[in-house]
């Protein structure tokens, strides 16, 4: 278990627990045209063969990935929302090597977009709902209503929730976005529907720090 999870501490501001995993570009048409499917693309990212065929970043050896070139200012901002960045975990190196480097993304722009969107979600009705129900069992329908209040009813289908355990604990939230809107503040037009809502069922627990 990563030390940032094991050593997690309580915070009076519960939105602090809404953290970033990454920003993953979908399969580009130019790469799909070379016979690559979505599943292979999401597994290998920039290391996908025959293209882009860059060095593979391994999840078990994140710190072996090249440094990102992120500025000190950018790194400080990222560290506040991505607990696995820097330190002994090197999550930001892994994420950039797998999902960013083959697009030539400027590291400060790429990670800066993650930081900005994280703040926008935290300040939304959906973020406030998660914070206000910290440690509690909630209904999926109430979560969906908070998302709809934030960005409109059509945005609900963009949220895929992953849960583990019995009772079901919310462990991840994947949000599907339109690439053309990525540099704009989140709005009704930002979201793209996903085919599956996730495995969380009708209710789930919003976990809290500690065991």
Q: Where is each model-derived feature located?
A:
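Domain-level detector of nuclease and nuclease-like folds
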Residues: 4-211
């Amino acid at each position: 278990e990563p030390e940032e999870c094991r050593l997690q501490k309580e915070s009076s501001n519960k939105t602090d627990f809404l953290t970033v995993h990454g920003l993953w570009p979908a399969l580009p048409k130019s790469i799909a045209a070379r016979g690559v499917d979505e599943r292979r693309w999401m597994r290998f990212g920039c290391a996908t063969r025959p293209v882009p065929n860059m060095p593979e970043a391994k999840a078990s050896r994140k710190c072996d990935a090249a440094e990102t070139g992120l500025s000190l200012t950018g790194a400080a901002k990222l560290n506040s929302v991505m607990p696995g960045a820097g330190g002994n975990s090197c999550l930001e190196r892994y994420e950039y090597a797998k999902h960013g480097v083959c697009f030539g993304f400027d590291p400060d722009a790429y990670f800066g977009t993650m930081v900005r969107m994280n703040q926008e979600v935290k300040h939304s009705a959906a973020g406030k709902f998660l914070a206000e129900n910290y440690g509690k069992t909630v209904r999926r329908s109430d979560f969906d209503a908070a998302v709809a209040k934030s960005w409109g009813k059509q945005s609900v289908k963009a949220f895929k929730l992953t849960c583990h355990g019995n009772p079901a604990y919310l462990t991840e939230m994947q949000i599907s976005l339109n690439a053309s809107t990525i540099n704009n503040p989140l709005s009704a037009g930002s979201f793209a529907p996903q085919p599956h809502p996730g495995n969380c069922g009708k209710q789930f627990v919003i976990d809290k720090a500690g065991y």
